[in-house]
Amino acid sequence: MASDSDLLDTKPAETRHPEKAHRPDQPTLRKPDWIRVRAPGSPEWAATNKIVKEHKLVTVCEEAGCPNIGECWAKKHATFMIMGDTCTRACAFCNVKTGLPRALDRNEPQRVADAVAKLGLSHVVITSVDRDDLSDGGARHFAEVIAAIRSLSPKTTIEVLTPDFLRKPGALEIVVAAKPDVFNHNLETVAGKYLGVRPGARYFHSLRLLQRVKELDPTLFTKSGIMLGLGEERQEVLQLMDDLRSADVDFMTIGQYLQPTKKHHAVARFVTPEEFNSYAEIGRAKGFLLMSSSPLTRSSHHAGEDFARLKAKRQALAPCAEAGQ
């Protein structure tokens, strides 16, 4: 089994996160047994890793230090992170490298499409770093990646996990017009924690973005996720759930925050599996089509299976909606 240190970034925080170098080390909590996972290394994992490297692609699985990488890559599931490995934001929780990104690689959409075809994916998740340096925040690049995948793998369903496109008018419309099957944008934490956890973002802007997706294309599934263990109160989480339902979000994910390095935001506590289960029950009662809530839940974990469940839920509810008209 992987130790606590196995799940921490092995590169110095000063290298990947220069803006955090001056920060004092934050306290660390020992992980409970329910957080521990097996270290990756299966032959199937190695095969996925080989395809990713051959196509010179970046995955959020690696960059964010996802604890589920061994399980997902063994199933040939990978979440591709486009537009480079360097983010223009500096969120207190995130392990993705920060700094000044390079120019966009115009060949990347085709390389991603080639990898999706080679892996034989039935469902793929595409995410990105924040690119505040680009006039459209990278929206056109998202659209080009979607088009390239559709061209090579027309039966593959596509899920995008986007940045907030803050102060990028028209960017959201470009991505929605490209017709992904699922549009995911994570709130990450409750409103009261944004200043300390996600200072470059705005809670109500992110909510409005999710609401706007449904206004632009009601057929798209919308999705959002948060982390627990950042010091939030239960009532704040329940309010966030209500906010997401008001924005007509279909699917919510809730997982445990894990501290990447001692320079990152401290883990306030490890939330028990029973508490995660209670949030799932409450979310279903509030009207989400689907809830995924557990310590190791991540946005892209079991994304393909979840998409199939989402479609089935919507189809099951359709006759009820028609009867009520």
Swiss-Prot record:
Cofactor(s) it depends on: [4Fe-4S] cluster
Region feature Disordered, mapped onto this chain: 1-31
Reaction(s) catalysed by this chain's protein: [[Fe-S] cluster scaffold protein carrying a second [4Fe-4S](2+) cluster] + N(6)-octanoyl-L-lysyl-[protein] + 2 oxidized [2Fe-2S]-[ferredoxin] + 2 S-adenosyl-L-methionine + 4 H(+) = [[Fe-S] cluster scaffold protein] + N(6)-[(R)-dihydrolipoyl]-L-lysyl-[protein] + 4 Fe(3+) + 2 hydrogen sulfide + 2 5'-deoxyadenosine + 2 L-methionine + 2 reduced [2Fe-2S]-[ferredoxin]
Keywords for the protein's UniProt record, in alphabetical order: 4Fe-4S, Cytoplasm, Iron, Iron-sulfur, Metal-binding, S-adenosyl-L-methionine, Transferase
Bias (Basic and acidic residues): 8-31
Cross-referenced SMART domains: Elp3
Entries under Pfam families matching the protein: Radical_SAM
Main location: cytoplasm
Pathway: Protein modification; protein lipoylation via endogenous pathway; protein N(6)-(lipoyl)lysine from octanoyl-[acyl-carrier-protein]: step 2/2
Bound cofactor: record note: Binds 2 [4Fe-4S] clusters per subunit. One cluster is coordinated with 3 cysteines and an exchangeable S-adenosyl-L-methionine.
Binding-site positions, [4Fe-4S] cluster 1: C61, C66, C72, S300
Compartments, record wording: Cytoplasm
Binding residues for [4Fe-4S] cluster 2: C87, C91, C94
Gene3D superfamilies, A to Z: Aldolase class I (3.20.20.70)
Enzyme Commission designation: 2.8.1.8
Statement: the UniProt record of this protein carries the keyword Transferase: yes
GO cellular component: cytoplasm
GO molecular function, one term: lipoate synthase activity
Record-annotated Radical SAM core domain positions: 73-289
Stated family: Belongs to the radical SAM superfamily. Lipoyl synthase family.
Entry protein name: Lipoyl synthase
Species in which this protein is naturally found: Methylocella silvestris (strain DSM 15510 / CIP 108128 / LMG 27833 / NCIMB 13906 / BL2)
Lineage, uppermost ranks: Bacteria, Pseudomonadati, Pseudomonadota, Alphaproteobacteria, Hyphomicrobiales
